[in-house]
C-alpha cells in the first residue's frame, strides 16, 4: 500500500521556522517527483514546491510565494520528504500536503496524497 504521512505542523510566530516531514512507503521513493501543496483557509489548493526524482538529480522548484524562504529536500535512505519553512508569514497559514507526482498517458498528475498537517502563523 502506498502511503504518505505528513507531520511537523503547529503554531509558530511570524518570522519563525518549522520543518514539515512526509514519511513515504509502498513505492520506490527515488523514482518519483514529490510535491508540496497547501490550502489556506477558505482558499484553493496552491502548489508550492517540487523535488524531482533521482533521474533528474533531485532538483527542486518553488512557487514565487515561497521561493527563498522554503527549502524542499529528501532523505532517500528513509524515504522522507522535508519542507523547511523559514521567515514564516501569516499568509503561510494553511494545511500542507505532500503528494506523489505520477506520469501517465502523456500527462502528469498527483496520484497519492497525505492527510495533511496544519500550520498556523500567528502572534
Swiss-Prot record:
Nucleotide-binding in keyword set: no
Stretches assigned to the Ig-like domain: 1-114
CDD domains: IgV_H
Keyword entries, A-Z: Adaptive immunity, Hybridoma, Immunity, Immunoglobulin
Domain of life: Eukaryota
A GO CC term attached to the entry: extracellular region
Gene Ontology terms, MF aspect: antigen binding
GO biological process: immunoglobulin mediated immune response
InterPro entries: Ig-like_dom, Ig-like_dom_sf, Ig-like_fold, Ig_sub, Ig_V-set, IgHV
Pfam families: V-set
Additional notes on this entry: All those sequence appears to be identical. These chains were isolated from myeloma and hybridoma proteins that bind phosphorylcholine.
Annotated protein name in UniProt: Ig heavy chain V regions TEPC 15/S107/HPCM1/HPCM2/HPCM3
Amino acid at each position: 500500500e502506498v502511503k504518505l504521512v505528513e507531520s511537523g505542523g503547529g503554531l509558530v510566530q511570524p518570522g519563525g521556522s518549522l520543518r514539515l516531514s512526509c514519511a513515504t512507503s509502498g513505492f520506490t521513493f527515488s523514482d518519483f517527483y514529490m510535491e508540496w501543496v497547501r490550502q489556506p483557509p477558505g482558499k484553493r489548493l496552491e502548489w508550492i514546491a517540487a523535488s524531482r526524482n533521482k533521474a533528474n538529480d533531485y532538483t527542486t522548484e518553488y512557487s514565487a510565494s515561497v521561493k527563498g524562504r522554503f527549502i524542499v529536500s529528501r532523505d532517500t535512505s528513509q524515504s522522507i520528504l522535508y519542507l523547511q519553512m523559514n521567515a514564516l508569514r501569516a499568509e503561510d497559514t494553511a494545511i500542507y500536503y505532500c503528494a506523489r507526482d505520477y506520469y501517465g498517458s502523456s500527462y502528469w498528475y498527483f496520484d497519492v496524497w497525505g492527510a495533511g498537517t496544519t500550520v498556523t502563523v500567528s502572534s
